[in-house]
Amino acid sequence: ERIELARLREAFPEDILEVSEFRGDLRITVRRERIAEILLFLRDDPALRFNFFSECLGVDYLDPATGAPILGKQWRFEVVYNLYSLHNPRTGEGRNARLFIKVGVPEDDPVVPTVTGVYAGAEFPEREIFDMFGIRFEGHRDMRRILMADDWIGHPQRKDYPLGGERVQFPDGRYGPSVAERVVQHPGESFFGR
């Protein structure tokens, strides 16, 4: 068992919900209520030293066809934290390791504790997740939109956000296709349908 998982199981035995590994990267899903404490532990534990917060991002698992989350998820949204333990040759701290910590967020209660007290660099990514997905970060000192206009209605990265569009006239006088007219290739197909 990898040291990150072993140390977390020891310190937070009731809070680890799911563990997976993909291409050498460990992904651990934890209880959202404990996220700040868990990240603080990962940052400050001498054996781990996850001292670099790379990013956090939102994921919407909604299947628009069924209205339910895909992949057997119990929740519609996730917030994923990407952490690194960078080695410092002068102090000997850090391990050159990457770790993904995830929290599930239900649609009817889209709130996660802020981690800005642990990693100051989470301030703007948390605001972006709020703006795009509508997930609020409890305790964040400036929880307002960062990309969309303040009076924007809705959250555009949600899979149930209505696709809009406006007619755009090109310099040669033609108009581009409407959203309804566009045919989007399936990611597994070539442009020639093969």
What does each model-found stretch correspond to?
Residues 1-194:
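Terminal low-complexity/charged segments
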